C-alpha cells in the first residue's frame, strides 16, 4: 500500500507565515453544492498528493459566470488565495475556467505560483501546434467568455485559436444536472457514462468542424 507521506523526513522547520505542512496544492472552489466525479478537481481522489480546498464564500457559478459585474468576486477570491498561502500551500489553482478573469490580480497578490484556469494552457498549446494549425478552446458557455478572460491568461486576439461552447452543439443533459442554474436539482447528480458520451460526441464534432485543429483545451 502506498502511503501519502514521506517517512524519510528526519528534520522539520517552520516557514514564515505558514500554519500547515504537507499539502502542495491549494484549490479555490466555488460556493456551490455539487459533486465531482473521481478525476474532477473538486474530488480530492484526483490527486496523488495532499491538497487543501478553500471555498470562495459568496462566489457561485451564477455570480462568477453569469453576472455582468464581476468586481464583487475579487476580494473573496483574494481572501481565499491568501488563506491557502498562509496555510502552507506551494501553489494555488481554481476549479473553474472562468476564474481566468482574475489570473493577473491573484498572481500579484500572493507569493506562490497561481493557476486560476485551464485557459492558461492555450498560449502554450498554440506554440506547440505552430501557426498553421489552431487550438480549439472548448468552453461550457462561450457567450460568457469575455476578452478579459483571454487577456488575463495571455491569449492574443486574432491568434491561432477557435472557441466553441456546449450551446453550439445542443444540450449536454448531465452538465445541466450538475451546474445549470434553474435546471439542476437542489442536490445535483449525474451519471458518468452519460456525461462521457455527451462530452465525447460534442468534442468530436468540434474537432471535425476544424480540420486544422492541432490541439484542444477544455475550459
Name what the model sees in each region.
Residues 194-214:
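A short, acidic, amphipathic alpha-helical segment used as a generic capping/interface helix at domain edges
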Residues 71, 75-101:
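Long, hydrophobic/aromatic-enriched structural stretches that serve as scaffold segments
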Residues 2-74, 139-144, 148-191:
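N-terminal glycine-rich anion-binding loop in soluble enzyme alpha/beta folds
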Residues 127-133, 148-153:
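Active-site-proximal loop->helix
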Residues 33, 91-103, 115-121, 140-145, ...:
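Gly/Ser/Thr-rich loops at beta-strand to alpha-helix junctions
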Amino acid at each position: 500500500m502506498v502511503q501519502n507521506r514521506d517517512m524519510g523526513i528526519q528534520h522539520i522547520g517552520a516557514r514564515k507565515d505558514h500554519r500547515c505542512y504537507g499539502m502542495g496544492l491549494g484549490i479555490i472552489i466555488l460556493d456551490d453544492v455539487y459533486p465531482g466525479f473521481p478525476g474532477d478537481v473538486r474530488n480530492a481522489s484526483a490527486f496523488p498528493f495532499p491538497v487543501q480546498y478553500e471555498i470562495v464564500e459568496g462566489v457561485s457559478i451564477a455570480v462568477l459566470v453569469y453576472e455582468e459585474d464581476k468586481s464583487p468576486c475579487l476580494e473573496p477570491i483574494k481572501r481565499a488565495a491568501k488563506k491557502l498561502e498562509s496555510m502552507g500551500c506551494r501553489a494555488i489553482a481554481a476549479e473553474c475556467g472562468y476564474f481566468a478573469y482574475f489570473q493577473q490580480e491573484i498572481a500579484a497578490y500572493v507569493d506562490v505560483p497561481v493557476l486560476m484556469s485551464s485557459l492558461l494552457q492555450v498560449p502554450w498549446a498554440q506554440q506547440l501546434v505552430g501557426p498553421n494549425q489552431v487550438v480549439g478552446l472548448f468552453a461550457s458557455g462561450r457567450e460568457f467568455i469575455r476578452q478579459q478572460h483571454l487577456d488575463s491568461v495571455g491569449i492574443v486576439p486574432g491568434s491561432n485559436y477557435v472557441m466553441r461552447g456546449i450551446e453550439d452543439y445542443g444540450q449536454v443533459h448531465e452538465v445541466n444536472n450538475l451546474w445549470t442554474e434553474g435546471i439542476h436539482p437542489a442536490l445535483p447528480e449525474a451519471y458518468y457514462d452519460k456525461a462521457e458520451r455527451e462530452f465525447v460526441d460534442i468534442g468530436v464534432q468540434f474537432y471535425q468542424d476544424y480540420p486544422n485543429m492541432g490541439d484542444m483545451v477544455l475550459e
